[in-house]
Amino acid sequence: MSPVQGTQASGTNALIPRLLLMVFGLSLFFGSAARADSWSAGAVVTYDQVEWGESTTAAGMLLNASYDTVYGPTGDEFVIGSTTPGYFALFTDEVNLDDFIPASGAPGPLDANLSNPSTSSAGVYAGQVAALKLNLDFSNAGLLPNSSGLLLGNLVLTGFSGSESSLNGMTVDQFFGLSQAELAGQSTTIGFPDIDNLGANINAAFDAGQPDSFAQDHLVAPGSSAAMPELPTLLLAAVGVLAAAMFRKKRTLGRPNPI
């Protein structure tokens, strides 16, 4: 018997580290691309329900000064929840809305249609939905100026796992629709208290223009590279398969041939 030449096996040994090094470099590149999308101060502006409900804050003064500008086209009506199906809360001016937020109590759905209420069965959750609506509506009206030029409703949710993984790829506008349905008493994929916590996190994500950790980890601009973190993982998996195939080939090449 004579052994087969080992040059091909040696070439395989040299190739695998080079492939792994290439994948490592690509991982660094895509990781840097994601980090390059991190938010800076003033990029987006939001306020939480406490700020919207306090007349002496920047948000409260903005609400009192511009309520008619934003909601005048709808007859000054501010509605949270849903008229069909489910329940809603209707406010007809900023004074009544200001009396309602910030809301308190255990989060839950509405259990009746309400007009200018000061409290509701939905507890703190109704206040979160109201604050998110204010953030979205005032952003759309150009009354929450920012340095990015982005509308809050167009930002994309990302980085969630487990029971919240269905949120990945959803815009803030789409999440608000989910929040409205939950408030009205409709069944959704999130449920309480998670949807209440998420609403609170979005409202506080860019508090007065200052991005927090939730904004950095879970909100990206539309089309952002940060919303595509799986590519390095896929590359590693592909190289793993290739390496295994080459290893099997190397073992075959190293076997002695019968004379």
Feature-to-residue mapping (PLM):
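Coiled-coil-like amphipathic alpha-helices with heptad-repeat character
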Residues: 3, 13, 30, 243-246
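Bacterial N-terminal signal peptides that target proteins for export
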Residues: 3-20, 231
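Bacterial N-terminal signal peptides
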Residues: 18-29
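Sec/Tat signal peptide C-region and signal peptidase I cleavage site
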Residues: 32-36
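Soluble extracellular-acting proteins and domains
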Residues: 37-226
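A short, hydrophobic C-terminal helix/tail in secreted or cell-surface proteins
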Residues: 229-247
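C-terminal membrane-anchoring or membrane-association module
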Residues: 244-259
